[in-house]
Amino acid sequence: LLIEDYGFDVDNAAIYYLFDRDPDSNTDSAFIEEMLGKLGSARDVNPDMMRQGMLLLSYPCIESFIGMNLLDDSLAYCWNKGVQNGHQLKQALNQDGALANKITQETLIKSVEALITALNTVGVNTQADELLNSLDRFADNNRKVYDWQEEQRRQKGGYGLLSLMAIALLDLGLIQSAEDE
């Protein structure tokens, strides 16, 4: 529709693939690992895919982004609550009153701060210049997150609450580092 009716040029658009890493519904680890390597840039075309795109995983589901906006120590939330899949997370967030309609400009900044904390924990270099420069080649950082989360699941029985959706906000310049201003 966008392409045909409005002449939208997807070849010059940033494309993000939001993907739940719910262990109950997305069980094909080999496919996910393959996509981590192929979908590493929102703007640069991957020859294997014939289209650009950045894979942004959420652990265990996209509602993790709500948690990162509204919860303190969001990374530990799933472990502390015994949450192991997306359905359980949705229920827990609802019970705790962490609802999407409570997201504000201030909580979006909190979600980026939670993301930076989580990426530091994983071992991703989050110095402003390094992180922002890595957004055009995010596959390596994505892989670090994936490997770390899989190890946490083996050790603790579940993933840490984490959504990479804020990466898109940083990549698009909708949220900027204070160092950039």
Name each region found by the language model.
Residues 1-10:
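Short, surface-exposed loop/strand segments
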Residues 6, 16-17, 59, 77, ...:
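Sequence-level detector for tyrosine residue identity
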Residues 9, 24-26, 151, 175:
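A generic signature of intrinsically disordered, low-complexity regions enriched in glycine/proline
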Residues 9-21:
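Glycine-rich, often proline-containing surface loops adjacent to acidic residues and nearby aromatics
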Residues 1, 28-31, 161:
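Phosphate/oxyanion-binding active-site loops and adjacent basic polyanion-contact surfaces
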Residues 9, 55, 159-162:
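Compositionally biased, intrinsically disordered low-complexity regions
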Residues 18-127, 169:
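Activity-critical C-terminal alpha-helical subdomain
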Residues 99-181:
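Extended, basic/helix-rich recognition subdomains
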